[in-house]
Regions:
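Donor nucleotide-sugar binding/catalytic pocket of nucleotide-sugar-dependent glycosyltransferases
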Residues: 1-23
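Conserved donor-binding/catalytic core segment of Leloir-type glycosyltransferases
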Residues: 28-46, 52-55, 68
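A conserved nucleotide-sugar
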Residues: 48-93, 173-177, 212
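Aromatic "clamp/platform" in nucleotide-sugar-dependent glycosyltransferases that forms part
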Residues: 97, 116
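Short hydrophobic beta-strand element within catalytic cores of glycosyltransferases
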Residues: 133-137
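Conserved acidic donor-binding segment of nucleotide-sugar-dependent glycosyltransferases
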Residues: 149-150, 154-161, 170-176
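A short, well-ordered alpha-helix in the C-terminal region of glycosyltransferases
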Residues: 163, 170, 177-191, 203
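C-terminal alpha-helical cap of glycosyltransferases
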Residues: 194-212
Length: 212
């Protein structure tokens, strides 16, 4: 907590948390090689077209690479046309809204975030909690809370498609780096576990009770 003029306490509490009892998965021995995921609405601010364009550059070097986009929204038709334009029908999949993404996340190698703007991204929290490293634009305001650059993922310059390409390619090529980022992702996610979040709420309510 922080105090303004030593009077008003301010607490920063995440909008989501992870279950401390959840199982975690190593990046080794995943059943589907080179599967990447992205969780978010099919809307302009998410810039999923950047990810589709990225795939057009990566597939020649990684012919088994897949990108699964989970979400819904008005840009779906546009994205389908873009996928067809790049002949990526066997590589990019618009999966729509899925209630339980646990299995999908557990079988992924990399998560992508290419938004213009973000809050506290619950999708990224879910992926790092399961050991899936994320490559994200340096978007205001949420990703930097969840991703420590070069430790559990990559945070790259906003809208820098070339840097996006090289960062993702590096992760796909280097299994040791993926494993390192995977372990650090699980570790970093524990900051947002249910106990820590609930304890902060308890502190807030106790402070309110004292000041009433």
């Amino acid at each position: 907590s922080v105090k303004i003029n030593n009077v008003i306490p301010i607490y920063v509490i995440p909008v989501g948390y992870i279950d401390t009892n959840e199982s975690h998965h190593s990046s080794h021995n995943k059943p589907l090689p080179n599967k990447m995921i992205s969780i978010g609405r099919y809307s302009p601010e998410k810039q999923l077209d950047h990810q589709i364009e990225l795939m057009s550059k990566l597939v020649p070097a990684f012919p088994n690479l897949q990108l699964h986009l989970f979400g819904f929204g008005k840009e779906e038709t546009h994205y389908r046309k873009l996928i067809a334009q790049y002949h990526l029908e066997n590589h990019v999949f618009l999966r729509g809204f899925i209630y339980d993404l646990n299995q999908e996340i557990e079988t992924a190698y990399v998560s992508l975030l290419t938004s213009k703007m973000e809050g506290f991204n619950l999708g990224v929290l879910e992926t790092i909690a399961k050991g899936v490293p994320t490559v994200s634009y340096d978007t205001k305001y949420g990703p930097s809370e969840l991703i420590v650059n070069h430790k559990n993922g990559f945070i790259i310059e906003q809208d820098n498609k070339e840097q996006l390409y090289h960062s993702v390619k590096k992760l796909l090529l280097d299994s040791n780096l993926r494993e390192q980022f995977s372990k650090e992702s699980i570790k970093h996610a524990q900051i947002f576990n249910d106990k820590n979040v609930f304890d902060t709420w308890v502190t807030v309510f106790r402070t309110l009770k004292v000041n009433l």
